[in-house]
Curated annotation (Swiss-Prot):
Keywords on record: Aromatic hydrocarbons catabolism, NAD, Oxidoreductase
GO MF entry, a single one: NAD binding
Principal EC category: oxidoreductase
Protein name: Acetaldehyde dehydrogenase 5
Family matches, as InterPro entries: Acetaldehyde_dehydrogenase, Acetylaldehyde_DH_C, NAD(P)-bd_dom_sf, Semialdehyde_DH_NAD-bd
Catalytic activity: acetaldehyde + NAD(+) + CoA = acetyl-CoA + NADH + H(+)
SUPFAM superfamilies per UniProt: Glyceraldehyde-3-phosphate dehydrogenase-like, C-terminal domain, NAD(P)-binding Rossmann-fold domains
């Protein structure tokens, strides 16, 4: 079967975990793994799996006679901002796993169909990938005046990049809750959970809804969208049934629905408690396969 060719740029934990997922894809061939450190564990693992591994960076990749159809960038925002124009000039679609956010934000279960031909898409944040689908599930049934999410991730799964960009996480995720999730106002909070042993990613979503909203329809929509996410993130699950609260004197006449999630990683390379990272590589794979379907269809 013909497959779209892909390169992973960035041989760290994210890039390596992504490689294992792409190796299972029926329509993407991860042909290249690109890094800058010859001693990288990711490059060694790539070579062991038959993936062409190079520590000579993007210059080396783009100088090849054969080039990828899709690039997955798992480096840094700074590096991706430099590389993105070069990919675009060569007609290579880019899936951005960095905070650069140069292209439209994509959550596969919500808006992938709108961006299949985009030259560059970004995946927002791990908290956004986990919680925006739930806000969308509610907002497609009724108005959501306000949505607030709390993402709790195991402290060992949060590297220096995450810790240095907490403000960026909250701003970017809050924006996605509004623009993709459909809430009129969104707020995001992240907690680095120091518990030992490390716990799975846990997310809480609260949505303010009209007092007369159809609660059965909202519950059904939540389960439907959760199943859509679970199709590409098997460890994504509801921890309990959605909980509804009636209006109170301080809620301005609005009711509330609470949604409680857990994300367990697949354990491809990262430990299962790193569900926050696994949901990013799983979403990247799903987006890449959507790109590949478009690319292969156009080449027939």
């Amino acid at each position: 079967m013909t497959k779209a060719l892909a390169a992973i740029v960035g041989s760290g934990n994210i890039g390596t975990d992504l490689m294992y997922k792409l190796l299972r894809s029926e329509i993407i061939e991860p042909r290249w793994m690109i890094g800058v450190d010859p001693e990288s564990e990711g490059l060694k693992r790539a070579a062991d799996r038959g993936v062409i591994a190079s520590a000579e960076g993007v210059d080396w990749l783009l100088a090849r006679d054969e080039r990828p159809d899709i690039v997955f960038e798992a480096t840094s925002a700074y590096v991706h901002r430099a590389n993105a124009p070069r990919y675009r000039e060569l007609g290579i679609q880019a899936v951005d796993l960095t905070p650069a956010a140069l292209g439209p934000a994509v959550v596969p279960a919500v808006n992938m169909g709108e961006h299949r031909t985009a030259p560059n898409v970004n995946l927002i944040t791990c908290g956004g990938q986990a919680t925006i689908p739930m806000v969308h599930a509610v907002s497609r049934i009724t108005d959501v005046a306000y949505a607030e999410i709390v993402a709790s991730v195991a402290s060992p799964s949060a590297g220096p990049g995450t810790r240095a960009n907490i403000d960026e996480f909250t701003i970017t995720t809050s924006r996605g809750i509004e623009t993709i999730g459909g809430a009129k106002k969104g707020k995001a909070i992240i907690i680095l959970n120091p518990a030992e042993p490390p716990m799975f990613m846990k997310d809480t979503v609260f949505c303010s809804i009209p007092a007369d909203a159809d609660r059965d329809a909202i519950t059904a929509s939540i389960h439907d969208v959760a199943a859509s996410v679970q199709a590409y993130v098997p460890g994504y699950r509801l921890r309990a049934e959605p909980q509804f609260d009636d209006p109170t004197p301080i809620s301005r006449g609005l009711a509330r629905v609470g949604i409680f999630l857990e994300v367990e990683g697949a354990g491809d390379f990262l430990p299962p408690y790193s569900g926050n990272l696994d949901i990013m590589t799983a979403a990247a794979t799903k987006v890449g396969e959507s790109f590949a379907t478009q690319i292969l269809g156009a080449s027939v």
